[in-house]
């Protein structure tokens, strides 16, 4: 959106001029937004709301379910109109964090409540310049699906899946050479899969900027070697050619259709799309590691706008929604993982699996302690910087320029943007 900085400047001015009125737990209504939970989880959400309202007689919670495709724009419009939700599950956090429109959870959440949360999620998606602005909710941790039949057809041992990224690429090349299928179903688009900055982090190259964010560190031989590895894999057709511009769920379809032999994913919910024939071929295992030694994780988060007149009550409801018991119950209903310590340690995640989906979820759950949250750098203007990284990396993948040329251009463009901060 071209006028986004202007809109947020207006918001900052409006917030400073119209402070929220004092709160009281007497006849207030909290507006609560979720993303695409209305169809499958209405009973779960409504039960939580009813329980909370019963314990807080003066509070009512108005639940609004928003589609994923429109939530960021709808949230922005609500801020501009000075009528935001009190508690919201949103995407595109960097867009909002840099403009100081969200309440600090470090300020409103007591230390004993923070301690209940897994630290990688508390200091994850909403951690910006030393402060956390989100309440972590449900999460996902990557594991790997692979196709037994394609492994066997390529002469690979189906009982010995790859343990590292390099092994995954090597097996992917063998599969491509011997079967004509792609080795790995992987999306490289920043809004869908693992973008270039996450690829660098997986292999141990981090941070991307110096301590005072005055210049980038990305133009490094280490970064060049990591990105070259991916360019080589793309050119060797280990990855499908559509990986750069993949649409939502394309990577899942490539795997299920037998076009690709391996699919890094998060748990077992995709088994709903497996037929009996494919169930016999699909095997779950741990996510292959890069040099970092950790696996990627993501999590859904809740935010409270500063403009809410009910910040404290919204935070209280958010903590109730995301407590151990409620997160564990959510995980029993869906192939997701919790973001609290007690829930993550529950025997439910380590029980004997009853299905293929359970097997996959167990691999994800066992790697919660070995995960890092795929949070982008906490720097102003990151959205534009990420676009630059994607554009230049895409040109390198397409052999329109070398990796070194891409890094030179990224460095120049990023440092130019940093000079204005």
Label every PLM stretch briefly.
Residues 133-137, 142, 167-216, 260:
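Extracytoplasmic/periplasmic solute-binding protein
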Residues 91-143, 169, 195-200, 279-283, ...:
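Hinge/lid segment of periplasmic solute-binding proteins
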Residues 145-147, 297-310:
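A bilobed periplasmic-binding-protein/Venus flytrap-type ligand-binding module shared by bacterial periplasmic
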Residues 106-119, 161, 186, 204-225, ...:
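Short, solvent-exposed loop/beta-turn-alpha elements that line the ligand-binding surface or hinge
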Residues 171-174, 212-244, 274:
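Glycine-centered hinge/linker elements that transmit conformational signals in sensory
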Residues 283, 333-391, 395, 420:
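Long, aromatic- and glycine/proline-rich binding clefts that accommodate carbohydrate-like moieties
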Residues 51-120, 127, 153-155, 160-163, ...:
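Extracytoplasmic "Venus flytrap"/periplasmic binding protein-like
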């Amino acid at each position: 959106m071209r006028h986004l900085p202007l809109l947020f400047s207006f918001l900052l001015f409006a917030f400073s001029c119209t402070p929220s009125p004092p709160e009281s737990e007497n006849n207030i209504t909290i507006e609560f937004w979720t993303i695409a939970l209305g169809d499958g989880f209405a009973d779960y959400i409504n039960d939580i709301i009813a329980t909370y309202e019963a314990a807080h007689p003066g509070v009512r919670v108005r639940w609004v379910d928003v589609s994923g495709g429109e939530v960021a724009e709808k949230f922005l419009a609500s801020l501009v109109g000075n009528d935001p939700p009190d508690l919201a599950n949103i995407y595109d956090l960097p867009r909002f964090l840099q403009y100081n429109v969200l309440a600090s959870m470090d300020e409103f959440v007591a230390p004993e409540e923070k301690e209940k949360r897994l630290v990688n999620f508390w200091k994850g998606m909403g951690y910006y310049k030393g402060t956390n602005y989100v309440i972590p909710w449900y999460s996902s941790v990557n594991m790997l699906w692979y196709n037994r039949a394609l492994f066997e057809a390529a002469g690979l041992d189906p009982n010995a899946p790859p343990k590292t990224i390099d092994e995954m690429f090597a097996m992917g090349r063998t599969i491509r050479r011997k079967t004509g299928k792609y080795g790995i179903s992987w999306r490289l688009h920043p809004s869908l899969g693992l973008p270039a900055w996450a690829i660098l982090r997986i292999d141990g190259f981090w941070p991307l900027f110096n301590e005072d964010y005055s210049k980038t560190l990305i133009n490094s031989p280490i970064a060049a070697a990591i990105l070259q590895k991916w360019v080589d894999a793309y050119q060797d057709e280990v990855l499908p050619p559509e990986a750069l511009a993949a649409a939502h769920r394309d990577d899942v379809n490539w795997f299920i259709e037998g076009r690709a032999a391996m699919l890094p994913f998060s748990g077992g919910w995709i088994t709903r799309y497996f037929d009996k024939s494919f169930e016999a071929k699909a095997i779950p295992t741990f996510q292959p590691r890069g040099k970092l030694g950790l696996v990627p994780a993501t999590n859904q988060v809740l935010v409270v706008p500063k403009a809410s007149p009910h910040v404290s009550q919204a935070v209280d409801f958010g903590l109730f929604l995301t407590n151990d018991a409620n997160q564990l119950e959510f995980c029993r209903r869906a192939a997701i993982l919790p973001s609290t310590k007690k829930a993550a340690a529950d025997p439910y995640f380590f029980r004997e699996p009853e299905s293929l989906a359970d097997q996959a979820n167990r691999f994800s759950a066992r790697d919660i302690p070995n995960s890092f949250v795929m949070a982008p750098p906490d720097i102003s203007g990151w959205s534009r910087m990420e676009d630059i990284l994607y554009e230049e990396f895409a040109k390198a993948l397409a052999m329109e320029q070398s990796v070194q040329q891409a890094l030179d251009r990224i460095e120049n463009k990023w440092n130019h943007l940093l000079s204005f901060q």
